[in-house]
Amino acid sequence: WYSSMFAANIKQEPISHHHHHHHAHHSHHQHPHDSNSNSNASSPHQSPLPSPNPPSNTNLQLEQYLKQQQQQQQQQQQQQQQQPMDTLCAAAMTPSPSNNDQNSPLMLPGLPNPMQSIMLANLRPSPTTTTTTTTPAAAPTTTAATIALQANDKLQALTPPMDVTPPKSPAKSQQSCAEPEKEHDLMSNSSEDMKYMA
């Protein structure tokens, strides 16, 4: 095919050498340009990255990709989250009097000192009644919630839409905590009195 085109060009050549040379140059120039415009036209559809204006396109692609990933991760995490988070919250909260009392010395001075203050700030407004009255329960609750929040923060770092669940998980933790806290209230009456005296 290419040689036949050349043959046609060569046949035209004797007509006017100069015109043919110009035409050959033009067609030669046009052909790569054609393929370029084709590849440019097709490449943004196939892969926006090699497009002439990378910033806007890559940003668009990145945003779309991130959105897709976040949606996928959010769906996965909502499926994972709603089952394990419930069980994790319930598991973390129900043994909260015993289990997290052991954890709290490790947790409080250790990792989440800034996290702890944030958690306390987050916890104070909503379960004020429970946290203020039950000091011993407050510590396990916060540590358990801190662990949950740390997990959520790691997820949040990956997926901003995870903001959906942290409001949920404190609410869940309050509901699931309410029972251990009530049991703990009966156990911790003396320390409540001590707190009130202090």
UniProtKB/Swiss-Prot annotation:
Residues 17-31 have a biased composition (Basic residues). One of its GO terms (cellular component) is nucleus. One of its GO terms (biological process) is segmentation. The keyword Zinc applies. Residues 95-105 have a biased composition (Polar residues). Residues 179-198 have a biased composition (Basic and acidic residues). GO terms for molecular function: DNA binding; zinc ion binding. Residues 35-46, 56-83 have a biased composition (Low complexity). Its main location: nucleus. It is found in: Nucleus. Transmembrane segments: none annotated. Residues 16-111, 152-198 are annotated as: Disordered. Keywords: Developmental protein, DNA-binding, Gap protein, Metal-binding, Nucleus, Repeat, Zinc, Zinc-finger. It comes from the Eukaryota. Belongs to the hunchback C2H2-type zinc-finger protein family. Gap class segmentation protein that controls development of head structures. This is Protein hunchback.
